[in-house]
Amino acid sequence: MKLKHLEMTLQPIRGYYHPRAALEQYQTPAPLAARLLYHALMKGDIEGKTVCDLGCGTGVLAIGAALLGADRVRAVDCDPKAVEGANANAAQLDAHVEFIVADVRDDALPGLLESCDTVIMNPPFGAQKAHADRPFIDLALSIAPVTYSIFNAGSAQFIKTYTAQRAEIDEKVGGIFPIKRTFSFHTHDVQEIEVEILRLIRKQ
């Protein structure tokens, strides 16, 4: 599947019915999701692999991984309503994904997920709660040797420092995350946020 075809396939995926600001629930746009997934595919980290999506929301990354030939896809989110929507989205595209309602901070989750080959995720940026992305990073590095994650542009140095003993940043790809007016505190119809996709390789 080519990048443009992947983007078009992911475009109809529905976002949150009742987004929650505290969880920074913004639908990952299809172009950005496709870019992350296609990059991972080209690196050999999707097809035939066991893939985990942490903080899956309504499932765009997990569903995309399944459509790109992942052997097994497991996706986690703490919001039952989001997972309900993700299940519906997966069914509509005939994508097989195992969705789990759980908090990434749950000590039992690593055992439940077991190990996987690749983590894909778009964690909270920390706009509502500082360092909200850290539990996602910690879990990702504990269960997979390779992680692809979307962060605010300029986060690479912090991530490099935070994960210095555990992982190294292998690649960085820039992108744009258009955030539509969703909550009462938004002042623009659309605000384009510069982001970066980081590929983290766990140290042996």
What are these model-predicted stretches?
Residues 1-204:
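Class I S-adenosyl-L-methionine-dependent methyltransferase catalytic core
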